[in-house]
């Protein structure tokens, strides 16, 4: 299908996972391959996915496939050994290191169980030493840094510290998601510091979403499409599959005034640059 040709989805959930998913990784890869999608990053909040990426690539060599590791509790937080292992999995499919997401202090303190434990990133307005050590490791290994579900203030601190360490590729993951909720000004600051900002279908397509396609388009207009990336965050068992998410997201961007050139930049060119494919 022409609308999918060349897209790279940097944020796709699929089974196996502890959370119910609409497709498994092979079903997702087949669906994307058949539609002409160029590549996918497999994202899991509980486990590293470099090994899955290896298996998917073996079955679907036409696809660019990468894995990620999220520094949540189940990984051990700022666990350098886990990240090193992730990069050593056969053929080097490990690409993105995410700061805590579901285990982030910022998300936990806004959730239903506010007394739950979390993986801290900062204290007293400063990044923790173990976080700075992790950034050193990411820089040394040439990996992509995602700011996870950190607070807006922490996100800016992470980007500044990453740039000081010459981390080349930085992703602000779903900044308009309810648990992060960056302002447009904060997103523009992140972009000006050299990060990419990710806009996911899930935040506008999930039941009860308070963010709209119009909100996305307005933010992208302020930030500039050159620093923005579109992705699905698809795979929730209670929502339509990834391809539907993409169809809706692309249509929503066009309906709100973004050009085909800008949409291609955000769904093809920018993700390729983030992943070192261009």
Description of each model-found segment:
Residues 136, 141-212, 229:
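Catalytic pocket-lining loop regions of alpha/beta-barrel enzymes
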Residues 245-278:
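Mid-to-C-terminal alpha-helical segments outside catalytic/metal-binding sites
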Residues 1, 53-62, 85-93, 136-138, ...:
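Acidic (Asp/Glu)-rich catalytic clusters
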Residues 1-63:
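An N-terminally biased module of ancient metal coordination in phosphate/nucleic-acid-related enzymes
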Residues 225-242:
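Short acidic/histidine-rich active-site segments
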Residues 13-15, 45, 68-74, 100-104, ...:
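Active-site beta-loop-alpha junctions enriched in small/polar residues
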Residues 6-12, 40-42, 66-69, 95-99, ...:
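Hydrophobic faces of well-ordered beta-strands that scaffold small-molecule active sites
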Residues 61-64, 72-173:
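Extended substrate/RNA-proximal surfaces in nucleic-acid metabolism proteins
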